[in-house]
């Protein structure tokens, strides 16, 4: 299922991407009308805390999920409960722009990443849209730990 987080849910959008959900997050220039248009045109489930936006979406028959808490962990647990994730998609999307990541040969990154990272890591991914590079460093391990914690809480 494709998702759309409104402006108030930026951290949630990032984490949903980490969990592999196709998650649109609007840029700062987009207004409510633009957000609703994307949700409708791309058949996305609108996630929002904004009651007025949710009401407009309902009138347009756009599927919605109201997020009632500001706590990120609770938000993620709600989504995991309502829309179970596909574990094969974990850590496959760019956290910045939502594009699917691609494996890139280590040799192509020789002068594009810090030397220490190049020497200590073997597997790299890149985003073809924003050109960000990813590898299994400390951020990766922290994300995996949080994924496992949330997943285990969801299953219990």
Feature locations, PLM:
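Short cysteine-rich clusters marking metal-coordination/redox-active sites
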Residues: 94-97, 127-130
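Short cysteine/histidine-rich zinc-coordinating motifs and their immediately flanking basic loops
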Residues: 106-112, 139-149
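Short linker/helix segments within small regulatory modules
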Residues: 111-124
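Short metal-coordination and nucleic-acid-contact micro-motifs, chiefly zinc-binding Cys/His arrays
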Residues: 87-91, 120-123
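Short functional micro-motifs and their immediate structural scaffolds
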Residues: 99-105, 135
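Long, charged N-terminal interaction/targeting segments
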Residues: 1-89
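Surface-exposed, charge/polar-rich loops and edge strands
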Residues: 90, 128, 152-156
């Amino acid at each position: 299922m494709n998702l759309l987080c409104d402006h108030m849910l930026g951290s949630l959008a990032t984490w949903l991407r980490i969990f592999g959900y196709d998650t649109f997050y609007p840029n700062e220039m987009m207004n409510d009308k633009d957000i609703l248009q994307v949700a409708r045109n791309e058949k996305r489930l609108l996630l929002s805390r904004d009651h007025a936006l949710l009401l407009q979406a309902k009138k347009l028959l756009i599927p919605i999920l109201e997020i009632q808490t500001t706590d990120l962990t609770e938000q993620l647990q709600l989504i995991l409960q309502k829309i179970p994730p596909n574990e094969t998609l974990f850590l496959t999307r760019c956290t910045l722009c939502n594009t699917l990541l691609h494996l890139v040969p280590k040799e192509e990154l020789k002068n594009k990443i810090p030397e220490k990272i190049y020497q200590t890591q073997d597997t790299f991914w890149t985003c073809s849209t924003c050109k960000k590079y990813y590898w299994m460093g400390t951020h990766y391990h922290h994300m995996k730990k949080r994924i496992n914690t949330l997943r285990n809480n969801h299953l219990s």
